Swiss-Prot record:
Residues 404-605 form the 3'-5' exonuclease domain. This is Exonuclease mut-7. It comes from Caenorhabditis elegans. The keyword Hydrolase applies. GO terms for biological process: associative learning; olfactory learning; post-transcriptional gene silencing; pre-miRNA 3'-end processing; regulatory ncRNA-mediated post-transcriptional gene silencing. It holds the Pfam family Mut7-C. Its cofactor is Mg(2+). Represses the transposition of Tc1, Tc3, Tc4, and Tc5, perhaps by degrading transposon-specific messages. Also affects sperm development, sensitivity to RNAi of mainly germline expressed genes, silencing of some germline transgenes, X chromosome loss, and is required for cosuppression (functional silencing of chromosomal loci induced by transgenes) and for silencing induced by antisense RNA oligomers. The gene is mut-7.
Amino acid sequence: MEEEPYKRKLTKAEKKAKYRTDYAEPLKSRREVLKAIMNGPESERERKVRAKNREFFNEDYRSGVNIYGMAVDMMKAMPDRGKTSGQSLAVWYLEDFGVWLKESGQETELRQKYLTGTIQINALDVCTIGQKQLLSEIFDITKEKFTEDITQLLDAAIKKQDFSVAADMAIQYNLLRDHHFEHLVLPLMLSGKDQTAYKLISNNERMQQQLVEFFDRMVGISVVAVEEMLKPYKETKIMTIPMEKLTGKTLDKLISTIINKNTHEYNFSRELSKFAKNHSQNGNLKALKFNISERYEKGKSDDNYFQHMVETFTKAEDVREPILFYLWSSNDTEKQIDAICFAIYLGIASSSSYQLPNVMRDFFRQPDSKLREAKELLVRRKTLQVPLNGEQLFVFENERRTQIHMVKTESEMNYLCSEIKSLSDEPAPVYVGFDSEWKPSNLTAVHDSKIAIIQLFFKNCVWLVDCVELEKANMADDWWQKFASRLFGDSPVKVVGFDMRNDLDAMATIPALKSSMKIEDTKNAFDLKRLAENVCDIDMEILELPKKTFKLADLTHYLLGLELDKTEQCSNWQCRPLRKKQIVYAALDAVVVVETFKKILSIVEEKNKDADIEKIVRESNVMAPKKDKGHKSYRKLKTIPWLELYDILRSHRNPTRSPQRPHDIKVIVDTMLIGFGKNLRRVGIDVILPKDVSDFRKYLKEIERVGGEHLRHIITVPSKSYEALKMDYDNYTIAIPELNNMSPVDQLIEFFDLFNVDIRPEDVYPRCTECNSRLQIKFPGPVLHFLHQYCVIHVQNVYRADMSEFPLEEWWNRMLHINPDDYDGVKVEMSRPSPTSKWIVATVPTGCLHITRQTALHTNLPDGIEVRIHKVPDDEFKRRNLSFYVCGECGTVACDGRGNQASESTSQEC
């Protein structure tokens, strides 16, 4: 059989020779001169290049050539002609040419003599987009011609679907036109270039509105309908993002970003939310359904529930009918009475009201006893437990009786500011408790003030600053600024909160404080959470807490013996009037942060006499840099020899339980456990590694749909997502606590204990960690070394550009002397069609390797795969008796030093 001619890859030098463009003189000589300068010291380049440019201009002028034509030819010949940033020969040349023309005093005459329309057109063609403005000035190109040229380039870029380039031109030259929404803005969004699209329409309210309306049309419709809507963009390959990004929560998040977040980052209009009616309705519906669930399934207080519902019903009439239907269609009598109660409260309890679902209209035509019960319920609800005028509330009703004062007017704010100022006269530093309650996120635009109440505790009194009432009263900005200054200025008081940075950020959203309150300048804010963490870092035994992570309720329970009632935590703090329970709940948090802070300090003083209390307090300052806790020095799995790893894991097989072989165990890991998943593959477990959350969900749906032998265990860690997974996949979901805090070996031990894995010595590299394939080809190290030397060192000139001739015969002879005993008994058969042929193939029991073609073929596969040998460091081949594994499906190379434990043995994914 006649040998097929061998096609060798070209070296870099050969490619240069083949594709090099030859330039005529003097362009060729000048080009080489400039290249030589650019290869010299960086600090000298610009000065020398600009001096040389002036020599060229003077030389061309004296010789009488067309200086404009020569300038265009030089621009074409520049080695870095397409460069758009950093030091650029083309830019320097163009700038110097413009300066030289002006200094010559003959610019007008030279233009009349040499500058033609053809040269102007050629000039526009040779320069980059960023150079066109300067070039137009030098080559006397009119604004109309310049705009026409840029517009043509922009349209051409759109036609080629090079949307980023088109957007850059439109932004730079202000060329955004009405038709660009359909042909440029949407394609940018649908190809994952959101930030570019936002920048492009940052000053175009009409297109911002169009963008919101486009995505809002997808809210609430089926996936099939969304696919049909986007079909034209899919067919033309404009849309490259996965469909999952435009459905469900990801679509909601995208619209929220456009109408809220972008008002700050890209100066978008603040009125965009009114064009997202479906999104707004959907958000309110979800919030109300969650509120109903909290009330009927988790025992949320009725007054809290009712307050939240009527506030949303009042602000968003479009949710009345669907929510009332949601309550009524439950066929739960209590919920139906609830629906009737809301209808009466809203004044729509009529058989003709269009805001009622049909079933409720029918009810009001012939009402039964539920109507009477609903009216009685409404009477109870309307007599909310709100403070009477002048009624004094207390945090504690016992002998302490800590008073609560409301601040709703300018005069009350003035009095509070004077009280805060008086704290400076105290002989010892005063601790001020600080907390805040926020408005519901679904009823608050991102650019509005987030904060509803600020709570302060000092001198055995709690002050509740009612931000909502003060906003309604249009309190002057000066009072807000005075309040913030007295509290966080140069005051000697210590303001204490829990996880306080979030409260400070919320306070800074008050319009009057947005520009004046600099959180980074705050020096007297201290965080109870950081204080407790710092003490636990010293010694967990000091506070005797069961864990290092905690909420405020945990600390008050363990340290004060006080149980915090959190039923009001998710109240609608924007709704007025505030109920007694809300007021007392809010006030209590401000009290306990100070008392817990002081309690911790007293415990530290008592149990650790050597502790530096001042330092501990100083390090709990909100603005203090967080401690660098460092990273635990875990031993990476790839540095552990296989037999050592095997010895560790085999001891975790329980003989009283049925064992499982690694390849029989099928799992999919959560997106936060990708590294753990690769380690499981390392020991042979069949693992799916999702690329992202949408990919994870896609796999879960597919696994559930197919079922049977395709079912897999879902491995995650305790979290909110785990709770959600258990609801849908309870029988398959496993959460392993603290998994991310374990070393790789401990992670495997935890898994082996859980599944009772039967691992064996021969299981070395049973599965590719990249693609999960079990089709591995094992080669002695010298064979892969030969491949690396030929394909990487020689052909690609990676390490030795001077290697023009490869010592092929020397390597061939070396292959013939490989001793199988040095490489786990792997026998290699070397073959080539003729003694001088460059076709060299190494064959082992599980496959073969075509060395000079960089291709491996597994015995059980029909096609070969390119070996990813360039990923292997050259140093790997210096260790003796090393065996390598090539994946027959993806070409990944891995190695292990198991063959000779006496040598510098290691297990390494290369």
